[in-house]
């Protein structure tokens, strides 16, 4: 049986490796890029005078015509904290769950970005299509409600991005009530 070449999926970490915080990963397939999370990091002790560390998004700016939007796993600062700063440079839509979107909207309001950024609330079990990608939001347990893992489908295959999660034998699930 001949194996079909379905192209290559690039997974490009722009932060969050070998450090705590600043989680941001680009997934690229041909003419489409999606960005999962956009967090900040807090400065190390030797970084005097620095309040926040935000990711270098030069790759996204250089490929802006391919970038379809931000897909956010949950509302912790290391996953959403850099959004207002990055969105001032690259205006892209945000896709996430209801509680997480509420937290993000408060940040956008603080930075006078609420009216300029497109946003879409996605439910667990629902999928969205962005360019060459289909992204399914999967309910996961974490220390914040409404957290998601993501099944990212592309012509090259499927990647499951877990975001953050915790094993909890007595999880609190249900509607976030936002």
Name what the model sees in each region.
Residues 2-71, 76-178:
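His/Asp/Glu-rich metal-coordinating catalytic cores
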